[in-house]
Amino acid sequence: MQKRRQSGFTLLEVMVVIVILGILASLVVPNLMGNKEKADQQKAVSDIVALENALDMYKLDNNRYPTTEQGLDALVNKPTAAPEPRSYRDGGYIKRLPQDPWGNPYQMLSPGQFGKIDIFSMGLDGEAGTDDDIGNWNLKDFQ
């Protein structure tokens, strides 16, 4: 009779591999989470810059920014409330309004607290006036 040679991994070998994978995961996952937060902030910065450029084009055509009441929607749809724009572009100034990376609409104040217009995301917490707000007045803090 011949002895059959069994092949496979022992329980100890499998456990060692699982422990090593766990250690690697504990090192990699926090880094990925930090990168997601940074990527979300960078998207908000890019969106705010694009919205600010569109608002500048609106002002060039109409000699004024939209009011706070007209809001950023004035970039997509011609405002009907006073002051109505005198020279509104066909198709608006952007195709659609983006949402911030956390699923909230961007906000605009005209006149702003920090400049002629303030464009901002309320950040991850969704509340205005907190440290995670990203606005056209503090973009350098997030770059």
Curated annotation (Swiss-Prot):
Keywords: Cell inner membrane, Cell membrane, Membrane, Methylation, Protein transport, Transmembrane, Transmembrane helix, Transport. Cleaved by the prepilin peptidase. Methylated by prepilin peptidase at the amino group of the N-terminal phenylalanine once the leader sequence is cleaved. SUPFAM superfamilies: Pili subunits. Residues 1-8 form a propeptide. It comes from the Bacteria. It is a single-pass membrane protein. GO terms for cellular component: plasma membrane; type II protein secretion system complex. The modification N-methylphenylalanine is found at residue 9. InterPro entries: Bac_GSPG_pilin (IPR000983), N_methyl_site (IPR012902), Pilin-like (IPR045584), T2SS_protein-GspG_C (IPR013545), T4P/T2SS_Core (IPR050470), Type2_sec_GspG (IPR010054). It is found in: Cell inner membrane. The keyword NADP does not apply. One of its GO terms (biological process) is protein secretion by the type II secretion system. It holds the Pfam family N_methyl. The chain crosses the membrane at residues 9-29. Residues 70-92 are annotated as: Disordered. Belongs to the GSP G family. Type II secretion system is composed of four main components: the outer membrane complex, the inner membrane complex, the cytoplasmic secretion ATPase and the periplasm-spanning pseudopilus. Forms homomultimers. Core component of the type II secretion system required for the energy-dependent secretion of extracellular factors such as proteases and toxins from the periplasm. Pseudopilin (pilin-like) protein that polymerizes to form the pseudopilus. Further polymerization triggers pseudopilus growth. NCBIfam families: IV_pilin_GFxxxE, typeII_sec_gspG. This is Type II secretion system core protein G. It comes from Aeromonas hydrophila. The lineage of its organism: Bacteria, Pseudomonadati, Pseudomonadota, Gammaproteobacteria, Aeromonadales. The gene is exeG.
